[in-house]
Amino acid sequence: MKIIMLGAPGAGKGTQAKKIAEKYKIPHISTGDIFRANIKNNTELGAKAKEYMDQGLLVPDEITLDMVMDRFAQDDCKNGYVLDGFPRTIPQAEALNKALVEEGEQIDYAINIEVPDELIVSRMSGRRACVSCGGTYHVVFTPTKKEGICDACGGELTIRDDDKPETVAKRLNVYHNQTQPLINYYHGLGLLEEVDGTKEALEVFEDIIGILGKVAQ
Protein backbone atom coordinates (compact mmCIF):
# COMPACT_ATOMS: atom_id res chain seq x y z
CA MET A 1 0.00 0.00 0.00
CA LYS A 2 1.64 3.21 -1.22
CA ILE A 3 0.14 6.42 0.10
CA ILE A 4 0.80 10.13 -0.35
CA MET A 5 -0.50 12.53 2.31
CA LEU A 6 -1.78 15.91 1.14
CA GLY A 7 -3.06 18.91 3.07
CA ALA A 8 -2.11 22.36 4.30
CA PRO A 9 0.56 22.85 6.97
CA GLY A 10 -1.10 22.13 10.31
CA ALA A 11 -3.80 19.89 8.78
CA GLY A 12 -2.46 16.88 10.68
CA LYS A 13 -0.67 15.02 7.87
CA GLY A 14 2.24 13.93 10.05
CA THR A 15 0.00 12.73 12.88
CA GLN A 16 -2.17 10.66 10.55
CA ALA A 17 0.83 9.34 8.58
CA LYS A 18 2.34 7.95 11.79
CA LYS A 19 -0.94 6.28 12.75
CA ILE A 20 -1.30 4.71 9.29
CA ALA A 21 2.31 3.50 9.39
CA GLU A 22 1.77 1.86 12.78
CA LYS A 23 -1.49 0.15 11.77
CA TYR A 24 -0.28 -1.24 8.46
CA LYS A 25 3.35 -1.79 9.53
CA ILE A 26 4.76 0.29 6.70
CA PRO A 27 7.29 3.13 7.08
CA HIS A 28 6.30 6.77 7.50
CA ILE A 29 8.61 8.62 5.14
CA SER A 30 9.03 12.37 5.56
CA THR A 31 11.32 14.35 3.32
CA GLY A 32 12.81 16.08 6.37
CA ASP A 33 13.88 12.72 7.79
CA ILE A 34 15.32 11.68 4.41
CA PHE A 35 17.40 14.85 4.17
CA ARG A 36 18.71 14.49 7.71
CA ALA A 37 19.59 10.81 7.22
CA ASN A 38 21.46 11.42 3.96
CA ILE A 39 23.40 14.36 5.40
CA LYS A 40 24.19 12.50 8.64
CA ASN A 41 25.41 9.43 6.72
CA ASN A 42 27.35 11.64 4.31
CA THR A 43 25.86 9.99 1.24
CA GLU A 44 26.60 11.37 -2.21
CA LEU A 45 23.07 12.78 -2.40
CA GLY A 46 23.36 14.16 1.13
CA ALA A 47 26.57 15.97 0.24
CA LYS A 48 24.94 17.49 -2.85
CA ALA A 49 21.90 18.62 -0.85
CA LYS A 50 24.06 20.10 1.91
CA GLU A 51 25.91 22.28 -0.61
CA TYR A 52 22.64 23.99 -1.51
CA MET A 53 21.32 24.13 2.05
CA ASP A 54 24.54 25.69 3.36
CA GLN A 55 24.05 28.50 0.86
CA GLY A 56 20.44 28.97 1.90
CA LEU A 57 19.24 27.66 -1.47
CA LEU A 58 16.42 25.24 -2.23
CA VAL A 59 17.60 21.72 -3.01
CA PRO A 60 16.85 20.97 -6.70
CA ASP A 61 13.89 18.67 -7.33
CA GLU A 62 16.01 16.00 -9.00
CA ILE A 63 18.17 15.56 -5.88
CA THR A 64 15.11 15.36 -3.62
CA LEU A 65 13.45 12.87 -5.99
CA ASP A 66 16.60 10.72 -6.10
CA MET A 67 16.63 10.63 -2.29
CA VAL A 68 12.94 9.66 -2.19
CA MET A 69 13.36 6.90 -4.79
CA ASP A 70 16.46 5.63 -2.97
CA ARG A 71 14.39 5.43 0.23
CA PHE A 72 11.62 3.54 -1.59
CA ALA A 73 14.19 0.94 -2.70
CA GLN A 74 14.98 -0.06 0.89
CA ASP A 75 13.69 -3.38 2.23
CA ASP A 76 11.17 -1.91 4.68
CA CYS A 77 9.25 -0.32 1.78
CA LYS A 78 8.52 -3.57 -0.04
CA ASN A 79 4.96 -3.64 1.35
CA GLY A 80 4.39 0.08 0.87
CA TYR A 81 4.92 3.39 2.65
CA VAL A 82 3.27 6.64 3.72
CA LEU A 83 4.93 9.63 2.05
CA ASP A 84 4.60 12.96 3.88
CA GLY A 85 6.01 16.29 2.63
CA PHE A 86 6.61 15.34 -1.01
CA PRO A 87 5.61 16.15 -3.67
CA ARG A 88 4.86 19.82 -3.02
CA THR A 89 4.47 21.02 -6.62
CA ILE A 90 3.04 19.72 -9.90
CA PRO A 91 6.52 19.29 -11.50
CA GLN A 92 7.60 17.22 -8.46
CA ALA A 93 4.44 15.10 -8.70
CA GLU A 94 4.94 14.50 -12.42
CA ALA A 95 8.59 13.56 -11.90
CA LEU A 96 7.68 11.19 -9.05
CA ASN A 97 4.96 9.54 -11.12
CA LYS A 98 7.36 9.08 -14.06
CA ALA A 99 10.06 7.59 -11.80
CA LEU A 100 7.58 5.17 -10.20
CA VAL A 101 6.20 4.05 -13.59
CA GLU A 102 9.76 3.35 -14.76
CA GLU A 103 10.13 1.04 -11.74
CA GLY A 104 6.79 -0.64 -12.48
CA GLU A 105 5.29 0.96 -9.37
CA GLN A 106 2.41 3.32 -8.66
CA ILE A 107 0.79 5.23 -5.81
CA ASP A 108 -2.40 3.61 -4.49
CA TYR A 109 -3.94 6.65 -2.82
CA ALA A 110 -3.37 10.37 -2.34
CA ILE A 111 -5.22 11.33 0.85
CA ASN A 112 -6.07 15.00 1.26
CA ILE A 113 -6.90 16.20 4.77
CA GLU A 114 -9.21 19.20 4.38
CA VAL A 115 -9.07 21.93 7.04
CA PRO A 116 -10.19 25.59 6.58
CA ASP A 117 -7.47 28.24 6.80
CA GLU A 118 -8.94 29.91 9.90
CA LEU A 119 -8.81 26.63 11.83
CA ILE A 120 -5.22 26.01 10.67
CA VAL A 121 -4.18 29.42 12.02
CA SER A 122 -5.97 28.73 15.32
CA ARG A 123 -4.36 25.31 15.67
CA MET A 124 -0.82 26.37 14.84
CA SER A 125 -0.75 29.67 16.71
CA GLY A 126 -1.83 27.80 19.86
CA ARG A 127 1.25 25.57 19.81
CA ARG A 128 3.90 26.06 22.47
CA ALA A 129 7.37 24.51 22.77
CA CYS A 130 9.62 24.15 25.83
CA VAL A 131 12.91 26.00 25.43
CA SER A 132 14.64 23.45 27.68
CA CYS A 133 13.47 19.96 26.70
CA GLY A 134 11.66 20.62 23.41
CA GLY A 135 8.33 19.29 24.71
CA THR A 136 5.29 20.50 22.76
CA TYR A 137 1.88 21.60 24.01
CA HIS A 138 -1.22 23.42 22.79
CA VAL A 139 -3.04 26.09 24.77
CA VAL A 140 -6.43 24.54 23.88
CA PHE A 141 -5.86 20.85 23.12
CA THR A 142 -2.97 19.92 25.43
CA PRO A 143 -2.51 22.76 27.95
CA THR A 144 0.09 22.60 30.70
CA LYS A 145 -0.90 22.46 34.36
CA LYS A 146 0.71 25.86 34.89
CA GLU A 147 0.40 28.40 32.10
CA GLY A 148 3.66 28.99 30.23
CA ILE A 149 5.56 26.28 32.14
CA CYS A 150 6.52 22.83 30.82
CA ASP A 151 4.92 19.94 32.74
CA ALA A 152 7.93 17.69 32.11
CA CYS A 153 10.87 19.85 33.16
CA GLY A 154 9.53 23.20 34.40
CA GLY A 155 11.10 25.05 31.49
CA GLU A 156 9.64 28.15 29.85
CA LEU A 157 7.25 27.70 26.93
CA THR A 158 7.58 29.79 23.80
CA ILE A 159 5.92 30.19 20.39
CA ARG A 160 8.17 28.95 17.59
CA ASP A 161 8.62 31.36 14.68
CA ASP A 162 6.92 28.83 12.37
CA ASP A 163 3.78 28.94 14.54
CA LYS A 164 3.35 32.72 14.71
CA PRO A 165 0.11 33.80 12.96
CA GLU A 166 1.89 35.95 10.37
CA THR A 167 4.24 33.07 9.48
CA VAL A 168 1.34 30.61 9.29
CA ALA A 169 -0.48 32.97 6.91
CA LYS A 170 2.59 33.10 4.63
CA ARG A 171 2.94 29.30 4.67
CA LEU A 172 -0.74 28.91 3.78
CA ASN A 173 -0.30 31.34 0.89
CA VAL A 174 2.60 29.26 -0.46
CA TYR A 175 0.52 26.11 0.01
CA HIS A 176 -2.45 27.49 -1.95
CA ASN A 177 -0.22 28.70 -4.79
CA GLN A 178 2.12 25.70 -5.10
CA THR A 179 0.74 22.61 -3.39
CA GLN A 180 -3.05 22.81 -3.56
CA PRO A 181 -2.98 22.20 -7.36
CA LEU A 182 -1.81 18.66 -6.49
CA ILE A 183 -5.38 17.91 -5.39
CA ASN A 184 -6.60 18.32 -8.97
CA TYR A 185 -3.57 16.44 -10.29
CA TYR A 186 -4.20 13.34 -8.18
CA HIS A 187 -7.95 13.60 -8.77
CA GLY A 188 -7.19 13.44 -12.48
CA LEU A 189 -5.22 10.23 -11.91
CA GLY A 190 -8.15 8.74 -10.00
CA LEU A 191 -6.08 8.45 -6.81
CA LEU A 192 -7.51 11.24 -4.64
CA GLU A 193 -9.49 10.59 -1.47
CA GLU A 194 -10.55 13.50 0.76
CA VAL A 195 -11.22 13.44 4.49
CA ASP A 196 -12.62 16.07 6.86
CA GLY A 197 -9.69 17.21 8.99
CA THR A 198 -11.82 19.36 11.29
CA LYS A 199 -12.82 16.27 13.28
CA GLU A 200 -10.92 14.85 16.26
CA ALA A 201 -7.68 13.10 15.23
CA LEU A 202 -9.07 9.64 16.05
CA GLU A 203 -12.18 10.25 13.93
CA VAL A 204 -10.03 11.44 11.03
CA PHE A 205 -7.93 8.28 11.37
CA GLU A 206 -11.04 6.08 11.34
CA ASP A 207 -12.22 7.80 8.15
CA ILE A 208 -8.82 7.16 6.55
CA ILE A 209 -8.88 3.50 7.61
CA GLY A 210 -12.29 3.19 5.97
CA ILE A 211 -10.72 4.37 2.71
CA LEU A 212 -7.58 2.25 2.99
CA GLY A 213 -9.59 -0.85 3.86
CA LYS A 214 -10.64 -0.98 0.22
CA VAL A 215 -6.99 -1.49 -0.76
CA ALA A 216 -6.00 -3.70 2.17
CA GLN A 217 -8.74 -6.27 1.54
Swiss-Prot record:
Residues given in the record as ATP binding sites: G10, A11, G12, K13, G14, T15, R127, T136, Y137, K199
Residues the entry annotates as binding Zn(2+): C130, C133, C150, C153
Compartments where located: Cytoplasm
Keywords: ATP-binding, Cytoplasm, Kinase, Metal-binding, Nucleotide biosynthesis, Nucleotide-binding, Transferase, Zinc
Segments for region (LID): 126-163
DNA-binding among keywords: no
Family note: Belongs to the adenylate kinase family.
Protein name per UniProt: Adenylate kinase
Source organism per UniProt: Lachnoclostridium phytofermentans (strain ATCC 700394 / DSM 18823 / ISDg) (Clostridium phytofermentans)
